[in-house]
A protein has these predicted regions:
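Conserved phosphate/anionic-ligand binding catalytic regions in large, soluble enzymes, centered on
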Residues: 195-215, 329-341, 475, 480-481, ...
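Ferredoxin-type iron-sulfur electron-transfer modules and their immediate structural context
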Residues: 354, 367-527, 534-619, 623-744, ...
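Active-site cofactor/cluster-binding pocket
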Residues: 86-91, 99-102, 106-117, 191-201, ...
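Structural signature of the thiamine diphosphate
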Residues: 1, 136, 146-182, 376-398, ...
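Glycine-/acidic-rich phosphate or pyrophosphate-binding loops and their flanking alpha/beta elements
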Residues: 27-50, 63, 179-192, 455-456, ...
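Thiamine diphosphate
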Residues: 569-570, 630-631, 640, 723-726, ...
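Conserved thiamine diphosphate
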Residues: 1, 125, 129-143, 310-312, ...
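Conformationally flexible catalytic loops at phosphate/diphosphate-handling active centers
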Residues: 1-41, 860, 872-901
Length: 961
């Protein structure tokens, strides 16, 4: 401390000199390439009276707006900040025209509690003592959360002379800071072509359009721009691709609101979103759908028909799903088909040349997946150009009635959820969230939102859905167990409930409980069509009880699910089949349902199972990653509640501090419950307390640390004291939500647990506290696109390991087991359902820290059989010895039993064949066979060494294999 201050100040001359040095190098760049970079660049009228000071991409929009306004005689300009730190006051002042009478500073950030945002404060300080010292300086916020900033909003800034502090892009009806914005302006250069593509997350639309804009930019004399707008769902969400190209530079850093070409890649969107209304008169609309003329007449909403007819829209259709099936691409990968159709209709490049370039791009993009995949894409490109059909628009469409769009709406349910859905979620899911005012969020300022709102979405995104045939069902409940989205559920109905069920519902007598009728409820509109359920169904005599059939043919059956899933849980059924079993657990409501996870996701079945076992008393701290995205994709929340209103309390802090965050949640519970425990003791020891109250207090205190029984004891305690004339009792009842022992979980992926958050995970496990860590091990950073982590095995190809990872996978389980007092398990659901349930139940019951590492197949693996076979892939991983299932339970050692159990059998099957079944490995074999042979051999040997080591643990802890 005696020298720190001086040492820090010694560098001042270097910072003081830096602006001049940067300008010197800018001058050299300018000389070489003809640019005009300065520390602060001015653009606009030479005699400007109102200047905006800003930095970043918004400056292009401001420049485009300035061109429009200056042409109309306005005296406006912009100063673009090129070097923010060190901030050169002299350079800023020199950049501002002498004629300026007002300055508006735009900041793309919010600093609550400050007198202004950073750039504004710097500008005010820089102007002090200059010739602009008395010039009014206004400050505005814009663009938070990627909020669109349009020319009309920039005009509002220039017209503002009253609000010294303001916002643009929103309607602030709470603090009234927002500026009124006029009608949308068209400020793009003449001849600019605007195209917008509406796709379904994971259908390839975004990837295809990235290729399209590269093709246009690289093979024409046009400038090109692309921007992709989509929600945070892992797949199945709405994607919008905005493409612009033209002969002049494009400065439009905002979304397209009027397009020359609009493509809808999912037919259900025509009933949900305003798409054709975005077209200019005479524009082109391409719809991917299976409908002929009669089908279009039946399915197109009246307002869509009327707009097409009255605005001279050229209308085309193509059946991308049919072409996808015919070419082997499958029903969901329609991207190259629609891309080919776009190039044919847009006529930017001659058709033959466009097809040639698309095929080259497809080879570059998919070549690592094999020649077969490339050939299918080429066939899809050819057919996409051939099978477009122009629709002759009937004259009658001009007078078609406006029927309104289908929107999310809640008519029943919990009051908090209904309010949230109808005021916020419905708008957001209809792509109208930008229209919501600030006041809509007045009840949610702390970031808390209601649980269970994903159930109101009913997206209907699957092409095919499971259809249940009771004749072939053995009531094993495996389909429900593996379903990533909780859309298929076994339901036990009483005779009265079965009689009251909607007509046509499929049922069968319930095995082992003759007083009940069994049905398999399927939510078609929440299904993603992955097919995992049908894949694992054992059926009878080789015939499965589940078949994947067209959603359109079974959409009307949604009412069966809505009825059955709303029936009360049968506690006697759960008791009969035991909740800690595969079958029994599925009779409990999943408290994670209808998430935004990918079809076939390997992570959500584990999380869903945990909520079925402990969800009514769970706290979850979730690391940023896939599990936080499917765990809470605003505005819909898939974590939900049971009929008592109990469910997981979920929160996400950051990526790197999640373990510490979860640990903090645990300590907070401990402190709160400790205070309540003391009060319960006071009540029990009171001479005035009735015996039944004392008994309830004693039961609560006796079960205080037992999560399995303390919940029931808590209910008895609250019931016993709720009407007591006692201040202490009233305080206990007031805080009843904190009374019961909670099940504290920490969720995250391998990128968090093995890499960035490892220090925190290690700290929490070392603490000895009763806390559970669940690692969804996909062996890559899944959420950010498949980067290598320390969980990535030798030879796997991933980002940052494009040539195959040279080093072996980190042995996280062994590190945790080295403490000796941490429960550790490795599981793979598809390999051993029972072991997965047992490990999760044991981990939660263990009175100390636990770590579960769950193998989770991911789309980044490139499973050649497809994600419908994710559970099969888990089975093969264990069967071949690639993954090992085991449990280390220190509590057993205290009982004189073996603490270690190796659940996996000795490896069998072809290890190399397993590796070659996934693109992440096979692509290396295609690119560099010799290297692949070396690394794959190393990978296999490492797997054998792991199994040898695990067998040594079996002997060390004194059990037979």
């Amino acid at each position: 401390p005696d020298i720190f201050f001086q040492a820090r100040e010694a560098c001042n001359p270097y910072y003081d000199a830096l602006p001049a040095i940067v300008q010197e190098y800018m001058d050299k760049v300018n000389e070489k390439i003809g640019t005009d970079y300065k520390l602060f660049n001015y653009y606009g009228a030479a005699d400007a009276e109102h200047v905006i000071i800003a930095m970043g991409s918004v400056c292009d929009t401001i420049e485009e707006t300035i061109d429009y306004l200056v042409a109309a005689g306005k005296k406006v300009g912009v100063v673009k900040v090129r070097l923010y730190r060190p901030f050169s006051a002299e350079a800023l002042i020199n950049a501002i025209p002498e004629t300026v009478k007002q300055i508006s500073v735009l900041d793309r950030t919010k600093e609550p509690g400050s007198l202004g945002e950073p750039l504004y404060l710097d500008v005010v300080a820089a102007l002090k003592g200059s010739r602009f010292e008395s010039t009014p300086v206004f400050t505005g916020r814009y663009g938070l959360g990627s909020k669109d900033t349009t020319p009309a909003q920039i005009v509002a800034v220039y017209e503002n002379t009253e609000k010294q502090r303001f916002t643009i892009g929103i309607v602030d009806d709470v603090t009234n800071l927002s500026l009124p914005v006029g009608a949308p302006l068209v400020t793009t250069p003449e001849g600019t072509i605007n195209c917008k593509f509406w796709g379904l997350g994971a259908d390839g639309t975004v990837g295809a359009n990235k290729n399209s804009i590269k093709i246009i930019g690289d093979n024409t004399d046009m400038y090109a721009q692309a921007y992709f707008d989509y929600d945070s769902k892992k797949s199945g969400g709405v994607t919008m691709s905005h493409l612009r190209f033209g002969k002049k530079p494009i400065k439009s850093t905002y979304l397209i609101h009027k397009a020359n070409f609009v493509a809808c890649h999912n037919p259900s969107y025509v009933n949900k979103y305003h798409m054709v209304e975005e077209l200019v008169d005479g524009g082109t609309f391409l719809l991917n759908c299976p409908w002929d003329e009669a089908g279009l007449e039946e399915h197109l909403p009246g307002q869509v028909k009327a707009f097409i007819a009255n605005h001279n829209i050229k209308f085309y259709v193509i059946d991308g799903v049919k072409i996808g099936i015919e070419t082997g691409m499958g029903p969901t990968r329609i991207n190259t088909i629609l891309q080919s159709a776009f190039f044919k209709l847009a006529k930017i490049i001659p058709e033959e040349k466009a097809i040639e370039l698309m095929k080259a791009a497809a080879k570059a993009t998919y070549g690592r997946k094999g020649d077969d995949v490339v050939a299918k894409n080429w066939a899809a490109i050819d057919e996409g150009a051939k099978q477009i059909k122009e629709v002759a628009v009937p004259e009658s469409w001009k007078n078609a009635a406006d029927e309104g769009l289908t929107t999310t709406h809640a008519e029943s349910g919990r009051a908090d959820a209904v309010k949230f859905v109808n005021t916020i979620q419905a708008k957001v899911t209809s792509q109208e969230g930008n229209n919501l005012p600030v006041s809509a969020f007045a009840d949610y300022v702390d970031g808390t939102t209601p649980s269970g709102t994903s159930a109101y979405e009913k997206r209907g995104i699957a092409v095919n859905v499971p259809v249940w045939n009771p004749e072939n069902c053995i009531q094993c409940n495996r389909c429900s167990f593996v379903c990533p989205h909780a859309v298929i559920r076994p339901v036990a109905m009483t005779a009265e409930e079965a009689a009251a069920a909607p007509e046509g519902i499929q049922t069968m007598p319930m095995t082992g409980m003759p007083d009940y009728t069994f049905t398999m409820a399927i939510s078609q509109l929440d299904c993603t069509g992955c097919g995992s359920c049908a894949n694992v169904c054992p059926g009878k005599k080789g015939v499965k009880a589940l078949a994947m059939e067209s959603l359109a043919a079974h959409e009307a059956e949604q009412k069966y699910f809505d009825y059955a899933a709303a029936l009360p849980e049968k506690t006697d059924v759960v008791a009969k089949f035991k909740e800690n079993t595969v079958k029994g657990s599925q009779f409990k409501k999943p408290l994670l349902e209808f998430s935004g996870a990918c079809a076939g996701c390997g992570e959500t079945p584990y999380a869903k199972l945990i909520t079925q076992l402990f969800g009514d008393r769970m706290y979850i701290a979730n690391a940023t990653g896939c599990s936080s995205i499917w765990g809470n994709s605003s505005p819909s929340t898939p974590y939900t509640v049971n009929e008592k209103g109990q469910g997981p309390a979920w929160s996400n802090s950051l990526f790197e501090d999640n373990a510490e965050f979860g640990y903090g949640m645990l300590l907070a519970q401990k402190a709160i419950r400790g205070g309540l425990k003391a009060k319960v003791e006071d009540v029990m020891n009171s001479e005035k307390a009735p015996e039944e109250v004392k008994a309830a207090c004693k039961e609560y205190l006796d079960t205080f640390d037992c999560g399995a029984t303390n919940g029931t004891a808590t209910e008895k305690l609250v019931e016993a004291i709720k009407d007591a004339d006692c201040d202490v009792c009233r305080d206990i009842v007031k805080n009843k939500d904190f009374l019961a022992k909670k099940s504290q979980w920490i969720f995250g992926g391998d990128g968090w647990a093995y890499d960035i958050g490892f220090g925190g995970v290690d700290h929490v496990l070392a603490s000895g506290k009763d806390i559970n860590v669940m690692v969804f091990d996909t062996e890559v950073y899944s959420n950010t696109g498949g980067q290598s982590s320390k969980a990535t095995p030798t030879g796997a190809v991933a980002q940052f390991a494009a040539g195959g990872k040279e080093t072996k996978k980190k042995d996280m389980a062994s590190i945790a087991m080295s403490y000796g007092y941490v429960y550790v398990a490795q599981i793979a659901m598809g390999a051993d359902y029972n072991q997965a349930v047992k490990a999760i139940a044991e981990a939660e019951a263990y009175p100390g820290p636990s770590l579960i590492i769950a193998y989770a197949p991911c789309i980044n693996h490139g499973i050649k059989k497809g994600m419908s076979k994710a559970q099969t892939e888990e089975q093969l991983a264990v069967q071949t010895g690639y993954w090992h299932c085991f449990r280390f339970n220190p509590a057993l050692a205290a009982e004189g039993k073996s603490a270690f159990t190796l659940d996996s059998k000795a490896p069998s099957g072809d290890y190399q064949e397993f590796l070659n079944g996934e693109v992440r490995y096979n692509s290396l074999k295609r690119a560099n066979p010799a290297k692949a042979e070396r690394l794959f051999g190393k990978n296999e040997q490492e797997a054998k060494d792991r199994y040898t080591y695990l067998n040594k643990l079996v002997k060390l802890y004194g059990t037979e294999e």
